[in-house]
């Protein structure tokens, strides 16, 4: 089945010597996905993070990660990913952040969540792989020498002006902001 072709039948029989090489298949795939610029190819071809444990993204996680990376490579700035409980949302967020960071297109990343438990879990598990490039924003103190920041919404702003530490970051300071579990925040807080 060739879903990339426009003027040929979807299904044709090929002999083994007619079958496209991996390079030809990759070229067709890139055209089909609109990955035509070298920069876009560099972003989309950046591999996942593998820690040697054998853990790999599940098929549905790969779909979410790859579609997000492809959308960003094409210039899309806002992306909503919806996943059910227990499907590995934090791992997906980490893989997206890692691939974009490693490709060099997103150098400063902010991961926002609504509660400390989510930040602690992300810091302890998936995001630990950023090592000394990562920090958790605590006690309303910011060190701008890091590349990856994990914070809770309430830790960046408050009802009093001096608690609004988000103002210490200039507009555009972050290249990528991951707002984790936004629906919960939207429904239960006055942040709307």
What residue ranges belong to the model's regions?
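Conserved N-terminal phosphate-binding loop of PLP-dependent enzymes in the Aspartate aminotransferase
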Residues: 177
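Short, flexible cytosolic linker that couples an ABC transmembrane/permease module to its adjacent nucleotide-binding
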Residues: 134-140
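ATP-dependent helicase/translocase motor core
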Residues: 1-108, 113, 117-133, 144-148, ...
């Amino acid at each position: 089945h060739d879903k990339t072709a426009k003027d040929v039948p979807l299904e044709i029989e090929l002999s083994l010597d007619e079958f496209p090489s991996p390079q030809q298949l990759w070229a067709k795939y890139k055209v089909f996905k609109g990955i035509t610029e070298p920069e876009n190819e560099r972003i989309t071809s950046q591999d996942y993070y593998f820690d040697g444990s054998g853990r790999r993204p599940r098929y549905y996680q790969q779909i979410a990660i790859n579609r997000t990376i492809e959308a960003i490579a094409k210039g899309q700035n806002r992306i909503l990913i919806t996943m059910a409980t227990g499907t590995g949302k934090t791992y997906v967020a980490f893989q997206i952040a890692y691939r974009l960071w490693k490709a060099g297109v997103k150098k400063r990343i902010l991961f926002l969540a609504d509660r400390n438990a989510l930040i602690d879990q992300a810091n302890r598990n998936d995001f630990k792989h950023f090592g000394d490039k990562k920090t958790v924003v605590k006690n309303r103190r910011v060190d701008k020498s890091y590349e990856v920041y994990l914070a809770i919404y309430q830790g960046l702003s408050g009802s009093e002006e001096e608690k609004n530490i988000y103002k210490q970051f200039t507009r555009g300071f972050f290249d990528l902001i991951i707002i984790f579990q936004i629906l919960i925040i939207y429904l239960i807080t006055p942040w709307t």
